[in-house]
Amino acid sequence: MTRLLYLDQNYLSGIAKGKAAFRDLEPALRDAIARGALGVAESAVHERESAPRPDLRLLELLRGLSGGRRQPAEPDAAGREVRRRMAWTIEHELSGRRPRGGDAADLDALAVALTHGDLVTCDAFNADVVRGARLDARHRCELFTGRRPDVLALRVRLAELTPEGETP
């Protein structure tokens, strides 16, 4: 079973810019894909969020990793429930945070990624939301933030994957 990875904009940008922790992640990603142990999925959110920075060529990078594999354009019933639970968690448990422009896009992307993927990257705030609502456990997803320890942990995790989805 091939594991499916959702890469958020932070990870794509880090790889494109050659940031330290991400520089070592890209070869691990490509190796896991080449072994048949990992698939990467594109989303409509990637297209919207990449538009302001065409110089980084994020979509080209993503397409090179995904091979054209796409997430569903819209969340299914499980995805809509995930989105509702994340929005509720933000409103009721994290109400002190001021909303940002990309929040709705993040919720949309994560709603699909959590219900259709195995490994999901997101920012630390959204990881707190997902974990607070226990959506990672419910949907059996592994979360990785853009913080250096998580980026390094993802690299190690990718090296462990086999085409059958088992760790050696």
Give residue ranges: language-model regions.
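Asp-based, Mg2+/Mn2+-dependent phosphohydrolase catalytic module
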Residues: L143-P168
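Acidic, metal-associated active-site segment
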Residues: S50, A104-H116
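Short beta-strand and adjacent tight-turn residues that come in two discontinuous sequence segments
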Residues: C122
